[in-house]
Amino acid sequence: GIDFTGNTYPGAQVPFGMVQLSPDNGLPGWDRISGYFYPDTTIAGFSHTHLSGTGAGDLYDISFMPVTRPYKEAPAPLGVYSTFSHNDEMASAGYYRVLLKDYNINVELTATERCGIQRYTFPKAEASVFLNLKKAMNWDFTLDSYIEVVDSMTIRGYRFSQGWSPLQHVYFETHFSKPFMACHMDTTSIVTKDRGRIGTAYIARFDFNTEKDEEILVTTGISGVSMEGAGKNLRAEVSKDDFDYYQAQAAKTWN
């Protein structure tokens, strides 16, 4: 299972789904092949692709992390993170929930076949959501990436990576249920190989002012073909900001 070397993850997906939306502890190692190891006490992001029960660590694509400012950050690979307790964690078919203790943010995850739906419940705070396309663990590393701000509620881009499986292409489009006030883009992380530049690892921070118990939904469609395909998947499968509806649909699919 999720303990020792069972190498499974606790997050949300539907049967045969392209999306496996799950927390990542943020640390490398044989025990964390799936991104999650039960004895760990940190979470450093919620990414949309995972392998279950394998002996090789890969994927972890399109990683989001909600925080309040100031936030906690450690040297890579952990980066921006929070502590958590299993007492504040719950999972069922197609659903996952955890409290990020350092920010008092409740995170809930569910999924459709090609989309991930996240619901963040914030305290009254200066809040942010990170999107880290540089985030990598174990065999996986970023070859190139891109983030485009379409408008104050929509972004899209891609992450190309290499690891256990070569030349993985994951395209995405993400919709926020609330406009972000500001976007801070870090494009200074250059990817090199054989002393030559091969790409850029994008990291973005989207800022919000939140009231107590305010909910923000972050919905992401993915595609292996194009950003346009990811957007079509998002609009086809998640047509409204209604987390409870999609959670119920995911549970129904499993049943």
Where are these regions (language model features)?
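Accessory carbohydrate-recognition regions in carbohydrate-active enzymes
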Residues: 1-255
